[in-house]
Swiss-Prot record:
Binding of a 1,2-diacyl-sn-glycero-3-phospho-L-serine, residues: 20
Gene Ontology CC terms: recycling endosome membrane
Annotated keywords: Endosome, Membrane
UniProt record, GO biological process: regulation of cell differentiation
Cellular location(s): Recycling endosome membrane
Highest taxon listed in the record's lineage: Eukaryota
Entry membrane topology: Peripheral membrane protein
Predominant place of localization: membrane
Protein's UniProt name: Pleckstrin homology domain-containing family B member 2
Length: 222
């Protein structure tokens, strides 16, 4: 930063209303700082013109104040602050008063410093990463307890073989076992085929016929 304007000004004290000579420095960032003397060791006060100052009065515009002895009111200026405080000053001459007025007015209306500060805050807000989440969301198959499927029939299915050897898949109703319960296993039911009784009937008929013929021959002899 650099000085925009520096010099001596008379300042009226707040309580005793006495005029005191102070050294003033106006910085390029808009800060007006005044000291006890030119050595700048003891700071009396400071005003951030773009933020704290709401008006600047000069000459006859100044209110409730009388110039110091030997000075006219045209050499006076007042800095009206936002918090209600008014800083009453008196320059060495009328030209010096106007020079301070224009310089302070430019510093008050210049919002480049404030805008850059706001822009920096917005940039940091936008570029900030989202909050870190330590726990990942569970996968759908973990949430519902279903494992990978690679068989020919879905889990919990009955395979029934009919008498003719045909296989049928029948859904199996099983109670819910919870999120981590045991998964149902495939069940295979094989029904035995019924024996073909046609061959037994034929053998029985042949045996009956042979028995009848033997008995007939026996009765014929007698």
């Amino acid at each position: 930063m650099a000085f925009v304007k520096s010099g001596w000004l008379l300042r009226q004290s707040t309580i005793l209303k006495r005029w005191k000579k102070n050294w003033f420095d106006l910085w390029s960032d808009g800060h007006l700082i005044y000291y006890d003397d030119q050595t700048r060791q003891n700071i009396e006060d400071k005003v951030h013109m773009p933020v704290d100052c709401i008006n600047i009065r000069t000459g006859q515009e100044c209110r409730d104040i009388q110039p110091p002895d030997g000075k006219s009111k045209d050499c006076m200026l007042q800095i009206v602050c936002r918090d209600g405080k008014t800083i009453s000053l008196c320059a060495e001459s009328t030209d010096d008063c106007l020079a301070w007025k224009f310089t302070l007015q430019d510093s008050r209306t210049n919002t480049a410093y404030v805008g850059s500060a706001v822009m920096t805050d917005e940039t940091s807000m936008v570029s900030s990463p989202p909050p870190y989440t330590a726990y990942a969301a569970p996968a759908p198959e973990q949430a519902y307890g279903y494992g990978p499927y690679g068989g020919a029939y879905p889990p919990g299915t009955q395979v029934v073989y009919a008498a003719n050897g045909q296989a049928y898949a029948v859904p199996y109703q099983y109670p819910y076992a919870g999120l981590y319960g045991q998964q149902p296993a495939n069940q295979v039911i094989i029904r035995e085929r019924y024996r073909d009784n046609d061959s037994d009937l034929a053998l029985g008929m042949l045996a009956g016929a042979a028995t009848g013929m033997a008995l007939g021959s026996l009765f014929w002899v007698f």
